[in-house]
Amino acid sequence: QSQTVANSVGDPNILKGFSVDGVVETSLGTFVSAYNGALDVSIRPECIELSIDSEGSYVVQECTFYGHDQVISFQNSKGEVFRARSLPNTIYEAGDKVNIKISEVTTFPSN
């Protein structure tokens, strides 16, 4: 697995992390990894579920509709911007505070 492979199957969010004893901490949470040391953590936009919460830790920057789905750009408190993709069941607007739930990540050694 590599970042090249991850990018070839879509436009994932790639985060840097360092894993100790199979646990890697990133700016989007803590995850289990089969690798130790410096890692890239790939999170596909459709693996990030947003929920509107007035006390949320993230802020929606923009939402782009594609008919069958939508891509939501959101920012953490460090100013890093990430993308989520979901069905248009919930309408997100710039400035909405949200929380996230991540269903799946892929890790691989950093180049």
Predicted segment positions?
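Non-catalytic connector elements of ABC transporters
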Residues: 12-14, 18-111
